[in-house]
Design a protein with these regions (language model features):
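Charge-rich, low-complexity segments
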Residues: 2-154, 242-246, 260-282
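Long beta-strand-rich cores associated with HINT superfamily self-processing modules
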Residues: 145-282
């Protein structure tokens, strides 16, 4: 969504229209002042990030030229599942899809409708693709010795939702939406505030549907932090690849640090507290 820079001349014109017969503009209300401040902060943050994002995209293109991505077959080896495991995973994914479509997604859309100042993004991708799920499960079977069913249960982001806020509304919005999730009966599993991290910024949380037991992820982003996540996703995937050289790994980490450093920080974001399984048991 493109945001136009506030034009001072337009603001003055509006004030003139509101002036009384003596040419004196009425004083702004507290809500008007807050809106104007919020608008300025949002616009300036957008322009700051947009300029940085352009440079970061160019930097990533240069990285890909220097470090061409190896062919999937050379990089990944055999990531296929045997027929029995494949059928088991497909059955499990079908069950997850049914719960996501009939229970969790309607609840998330209802939560979204309670506040027009933010919205869900990427809803069409809230379910991870079947091929990608199978790749992750094959890795878990191959490298961690897990059974396919166990590997499917431990995947963090098979079902994922993302809320996007303005910088000014971010902190209060996240806190309010977490309460809305609780009010809908979802059980908090964990929450991590990564706004002070070097290579990723945002808040990631997981929740459990009490009836089915299904875990799903809810991420909370600003436009800039979400776009940075998308922009650095390929770097993240290469960092997870054991075949990536140490030299390239250093460059990838530096690229992620640069992207993260350009993201405007929402006010009072430290008020969003972490939540751990240990706290849940306590």
């Amino acid at each position: 969504m493109e945001i136009e820079r506030l034009d001072e001349a337009d603001a003055v014109a509006v004030d003139r229209e509101q002036a009384d017969n003596h040419g004196v503009a009425p004083p702004e209300t507290r809500d008007q002042q807050a809106y104007r401040t919020e608008y300025r902060v949002t616009v300036e943050a957008a322009y700051t990030w947009d300029a940085a994002a352009l440079e970061l995209r160019q930097a990533w293109e240069a990285h890909e030229t220097k470090w061409p991505s190896p062919e999937d077959a050379d990089r990944d080896g055999d990531r296929s599942l045997n027929p029995e495991a494949n059928a088991e995973v497909e059955r499990g994914c079908g069950h997850i899809r049914e719960i996501a479509e009939n229970v969790i997604t309607p609840a998330m859309r209802a939560i979204e409708s309670e506040d027009s100042d933010r919205h869900l993004i990427g809803l069409e991708h809230c379910l991870k693709g079947m091929d990608r799920i199978k790749e992750k499960i094959a890795d878990a079977v191959r490298y961690k010795g897990r059974a396919p069913e166990e590997a499917l249960e431990t995947l963090k982001d098979v079902v994922r939702f993302t809320f996007c806020y303005s910088e000014e509304r971010y902190t209060s919005g996240v806190i309010e939406d977490c309460q809305r999730l609780l009010d809908r009966g979802f059980q908090p599993f964990d929450r991590l505030n990564s706004w002070q991290a070097e290579q990723y910024k945002g808040v990631n949380s997981r929740w459990r549907d009490p009836e089915s037991g299904l875990l799903f992820e809810v991420q909370f982003h600003t436009r800039a932090s979400f776009e940075a996540k998308q922009l650095t996703h390929a770097a993240y995937e290469r960092l997870r690849d054991p075949a990536t050289s140490d030299v390239e790994r250093d460059e990838l980490q530096e690229f992620q640090r640069k992207a993260s450093a350009e993201i405007p920080i929402p006010p009072n974001v430290s008020d969003i507290e972490d939540y751990s399984p240990e706290q849940r048991r306590g």
